[in-house]
Amino acid sequence: MIIRPVQLADAAAIRAIYQPYVTETAITFEVDVPTVPEFERRITKTLAQYPYLVAEVGGKVLGYAYASSYYARAAYDWTTELSIYVAKEARGQGIGSALYTALEEELQARGYLRFLACIAVPNEASIAMHEKRGYVQVAHFPRIGYKFDQWHDIVWMQKTIDWPVNTLKEVEEKR
């Protein structure tokens, strides 16, 4: 398995991984599958500030993970939300864990200290993976998203890195 930075050429593979999450699950609250050009736009926007990684096995992209802004205020500059998606046929093979490890390491190198995951529940596999990685549940929002003719809850999980906070200037220099 190779974990590498995303390329715009990966957009079609990423869309193929994401499509069943949109059309078959409430794991994402997105209801329409984005186009390849939309994924290219999202990749470009994410890479302007955050890491975006893919897992490749035998030349095929089987998963991806990226970070995004938790909230657009300066006081949150040490906090980021992580997202991960693994192809159906590749789940349970360690791809998600490898992606998360690489993403967390990159984020720490850039000065981020708080990692958040927003998880639609029920999703025992995602919650177990996050707990194994040191995340704890910090919030539960009942009936907050409506998809497939029913309401769905979300939970927020957080992992805290106990490093000293750098000045904003030091953090910006690492990014």
Regions found by a protein language model. Name each.
Residues Y66-S69, L116-I119, E131, V136-D153, ...:
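Conserved catalytic-core motifs of GNAT/GCN5-like acyltransferases
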Residues L107-I119:
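Conserved GNAT acetyl-CoA-binding A-motif
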Residues Y18, G59, H130, Y135, ...:
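Conserved active-site tyrosine of GNAT-family acetyltransferases
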Residues G92-E105, A128-K132:
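Conserved acetyl-CoA-binding loop-helix of GNAT-fold acetyltransferases
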